[in-house]
A protein has these predicted regions:
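Long, contiguous binding/interaction regions
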Residues: 1-86
Length: 86
């Protein structure tokens, strides 16, 4: 049975930002989020946050907070498991 994604559904996301953020930022990304430091081909550093669980309003709020701090957003994608079964 396929599950639809809606504005109010809790979904799992992966968020990638330019630069390196340490684990002290994890609270912004949800209690189950994990941070992964990566190096791109041009030797620039990025941080990938996986297992970010929130609804669309939470996601938009997070993106606004990052933008307000001047943090460059590289990508946001729906995680492998998509919508959570609750």
């Amino acid at each position: 049975m396929s599950q639809s994604i809606s504005l109010n559904s809790q979904n799992r996301y992966e968020i990638k930002i330019y630069g390196q953020l340490d684990d002290s930022w994890l609270g912004w990304f949800g209690e189950d989020a994990k941070a992964h430091a990566e190096i791109l081909a041009d030797n620039s550093q990025v941080t990938r946050f996986s297992n970010v669980v929130m609804d669309q309003a939470g996601l938009v709020g997070l993106i606004r907070r990052l933008h307000g701090l001047g943090i460059v957003l590289i990508s946001v994608r729906l995680g492998l498991f998509g919508r959570l079964n609750k």
